[in-house]
Each structure stands twice: as structure tokens, then as C-alpha cells.
Amino acid sequence: MEYNFVEVYDNVVDKQTCENIIKHFEEVKNAGLSIDRQSKEGVAKLTKDTDMYDLTETPDLLPSNSITSANDKIIFQTFKEAFWNCYNQYITKYDLTQTTTHTLDGYVKIQKTVPGQGYHVWHWEQDSVHHGHRLLLVMLYLNDVEEGGETEFLYQGIRVKPKQGSIMICPGSFTHTHRGNPTLTGEKYVMNTWAVYIN
């Protein structure tokens, strides 16, 4: 049994659900409600280059929009259920059940990457005092990518290939420095968030 703390759980979310989430993202994007990360985060194209939409567990607190409100709730709940199934397997394997209390972050990102785009620089999730509560990175791959688009880990020498319906979980610390490689053919859709400390 390997203990590199990078776990991939296949076929967690079914094909139709993944495609419905992608369809929802495209509707949001066409309505002008998605953002590009360069604009939002003020980063260079060579650093982060993707389109992104933030889901929240409480969309009712945001300005009402007929496209987002109902669908956001459904998608968030679907992601949440899939996450807890994988999370329980993860914490059992790595014996995290007795140490700390965690929950799923209240925000989930849906991201679209087209050929040439990606999160090109090496980075980790606990990269500032504001992000120190991020225990685990959680990523759901919404479609298969034939070439490129892997999540690559610097120190583990691992490349996780996007596979529709699979969830990847890894630690948020510098030990799991990673990057999103550019897609070479086709588009890549993912959802990601974090398991965070409650206290």
C-alpha cells in the first residue's frame, strides 16, 4: 500500500452529472457570470490562466439570478456528498480520525481550461496566513483529457490524469507542491475546494 498522501477515487460522480455541471458552467459563462483568474487575482497569464465560477453553499445570500440559484444548490450538494464518501476513506487510511475536526469549505470553484491554459507555476494550498486552515485539496475531474491537463506533484513525481467522475485528495501543505499542466487537446473542466479545520 502506497502512502504518498495523493489519493484518486474513480467513478465517484456519474457521467450525466458531470456533463450537467459542465453545461451549467457554460450557461453561467455565456451569461457573463464567470471570471478569468487573471482579472480576479491580478496574476500574469503565465501564472494562472483559466475561466472560473464560484459556487457557494448559500447562494440565497447572493444577488438573485435565475441561472445560478437553484442549480448552484444542487451542484454543491452533489459535490459535498461525493466528497464525504472519499474523505471518510482518506482519513481512515491515513488515521486522521482522532486528531482534528474538519469540514468542507463553503465555496467551490468550477474551472474551465482550454488548450494552452493552466495553473502553470508550482504552488501549494496553505500559501499564506489566510489559507492556513486548508487541510486538504479536493478536486473533481468533470471530463477526460486525452493529452496534458494533469495535476503534477513536484516532490512525489506523480501526474494525475483527468478522468471524468474521479476525485483527487491531497494535503494542502508545501510537501504537496503541485501545478496544473496545460491541456494539449480539448478542454478541461474541474471542481475544487478544500477540507478545512473547524477550530
Where are these regions (language model features)?
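Fe(II)/2-oxoglutarate oxygenase catalytic core
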Residues: M1-I167, T175-N199
